[in-house]
């Protein structure tokens, strides 16, 4: 069946705990560059993803990133993208509606093939969030990752790393003011940069990957537990796990339901601790699907996420 899901669209994913079960949101672009939202609550089916679920518009094939937290006004969501002028932009869910955020008015220029990642910590019903958005300013080999910071207003942050052009970026906060950023260095290895409240330093993680992989990262707990994901090629999604030390990366498989992904797919991940992890990807046939980890059951292919169908179908 035809889909309105843009071929090789970037993907962003978030989740949070709620009374009715884990809430998930996934963001992607349609054929016209509109950013759509699909929703899932608990074990209920996925909904949304249609032309009625547009939250904003970005340049075609814009990178996407998202963060969420609970505030006194309800669930807050921020979705980051790049507009047609390659300016870093933001769409805000303020607990009741989607609006355009402040970041776009700052005029942060982004490299034309830059990817994005974002993280937050500290956001609660009684405290504002600290948000970080990561991007590249230029397209050349050896260019750095740059950081833009929200702590009551938007300001430029640090820059670090020496990367391949258009590197994938994964970002996660493992605790208040403790940040982990993953990117592909000029030797094609996936590297880690760390911030522990006072300075940036190169972390201990390193993994070989083919050039141009998509990267996603999640974390939970006080240990902390970290998971880094990257797509190596057709049907080759890899995971590296940290729970005090890094394991040997392994391929995620479900022998009973092989589902080929596009060789140049982009991925996004969210989790509810180690109980339920989802990694979203674009499958052959241009459907939005997920690998799902359920504690005690392992990895399996989850439900297809709705992305809309053209009128007349």
From Swiss-Prot:
Q: Where are the sequence repeats?
A: 5-57, 58-109, 110-162, 163-208, 209-260, 261-304
UniProt keywords (A-Z) are:
Fruiting body, Lectin, Repeat
Where along this sequence does the record place binding of beta-L-fucose 2? 78, 90, 102, 154
Alphabetized GO MF terms: carbohydrate binding; fucose binding; identical protein binding; protein homodimerization activity
Top-level taxon in the UniProt lineage: Eukaryota
Keyword Ribonucleoprotein tagged: no
* Protein residues bound to beta-L-fucose 4: 227, 239, 299
Which residues does the record give as beta-L-fucose 3 binding sites?
Answer: 132, 147, 200
Q: Where does beta-L-fucose 1 bind?
A: 25, 37, 98
For domains, the record's comment is: AAL adopts the six-bladed beta-propeller fold and contains 5 binding sites per monomer, each located between two adjacent blades. Residues conserved at 5 of the 6 sites, are located on the surface of the AAL and directly contribute to fucose recognition. Because the corresponding residues forming site 6 are not conserved, this site cannot be considered to accommodate fucose molecules. The 5 binding sites that are non-equivalent, and owing to minor differences in amino-acid composition they exhibit a marked difference in specific ligand recognition.
Report the sequence similarity comment from the record: Belongs to the fungal fucose-specific lectin family.
Oligomer and partners:
Forms homodimers. The two AAL monomers are associated via interactions between N-terminal and C-terminal peptides. Tyr-7 interacts via aromatic ring stacking with its counterpart on the other monomer, whereas Ser-284 interacts via hydrogen bonding with Asp-264 on the other monomer.
Which protein, by its recorded name, is this?
A: Fucose-specific lectin
- Organism listed in the record: Aleuria aurantia
């Amino acid at each position: 069946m035809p889909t309105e899901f843009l071929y090789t669209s970037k993907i962003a994913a978030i989740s949070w705990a709620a009374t009715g079960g884990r809430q998930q949101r996934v963001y992607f672009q349609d054929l016209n560059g509109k950013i759509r939202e699909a929703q899932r609550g608990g074990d209920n089916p996925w909904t949304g993803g249609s032309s009625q679920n547009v939250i904003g518009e970005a340049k075609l094939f814009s990178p996407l990133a998202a963060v969420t937290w609970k505030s006194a006004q309800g669930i807050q969501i921020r979705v980051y993208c790049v507009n047609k002028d390659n300016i870093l932009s933001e769409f805000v869910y303020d607990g009741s509606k989607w609006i355009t955020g402040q970041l776009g008015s700052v005029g942060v220029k982004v490299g034309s093939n830059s990817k994005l990642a974002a993280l937050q910590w500290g956001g609660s019903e009684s405290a504002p969030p600290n948000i970080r958005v990561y991007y590249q300013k230029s397209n050349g080999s050896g260019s750095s990752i740059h950081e833009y910071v929200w702590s009551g207003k938007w300001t430029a942050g640090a820059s670090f790393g020496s990367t391949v052009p258009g590197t994938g970026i994964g970002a996660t906060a493992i605790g208040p003011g403790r940040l982990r950023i993953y990117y592909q260095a000029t030797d094609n290895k996936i590297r880690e940069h760390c911030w522990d409240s006072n300075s940036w330093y190169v972390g201990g993680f390193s993994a070989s990957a083919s050039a141009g992989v998509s990267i996603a990262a999640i974390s939970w707990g006080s240990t902390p537990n970290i998971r880094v994901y990257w797509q190596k090629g057709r049907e080759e999604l890899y995971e590296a796990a940290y729970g005090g030390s890094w394991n040997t990366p392994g391929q995620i498989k479900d022998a009973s339901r092989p589902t080929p992904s596009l060789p140049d797919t982009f991925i996004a991940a969210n989790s509810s601790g180690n109980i339920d992890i989802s990694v979203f990807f674009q499958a052959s046939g241009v459907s939005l699907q997920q690998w799902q980890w359920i504690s005690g059951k392992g990895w399996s292919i989850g439900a297809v996420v709705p992305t809309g169908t053209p009128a007349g179908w």
